[in-house]
Amino acid sequence: SGVKIASGEYIGWCHADLQTEPMDVYNAYLANSEQLKNEKVIIKGLRTNRNMFDGIFTLGMSVFVSIVFQRIINDINAQPKLFSKNFIKFLNHHPHDFSLDLYLLIIAKLKNYKIINHRVILKKRLYGEAKGGGNIKGKLKLIIRTFIYIFQLRKKMWKL
């Protein structure tokens, strides 16, 4: 993956749907460059300009994950994500789907990293449909898949 071959001191990503732009990664870096010098920091997006349905969905998932893992985590899939390249060593057993954002944040919390929210304006999707579904049926499938992964990850974390 691009993360593994990246050669910079910091690694960042955003989703390809351009609801947040690649420039948001750069802006997050500029706004938080001093904090990033402390290697135990993750910068993550905090989406603004969301519709009410998606906002409620995100809040519900944030509360659920915070309860299950006993650590406060909000707006899990917000983009961008930005961190020191040294953090990659903790991502050996990462999922290969949209659960990556959740995995990264849980590992960061377990390793006592500080998570800093960086506000981004969520833009309208220009092409295609959200993998999480732009409708109720898609959201329900995403919720079920995510809940299964959350419980699998929690069980795995108990073994560590």
Regions found by a protein language model. Give the residues of each.
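Cofactor-binding loops of NAD(P)H-dependent oxidoreductases
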Residues: 14-16, 118
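Acidic metal-phosphate-binding loop of nucleotide-sugar-dependent transferases
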Residues: 18-20
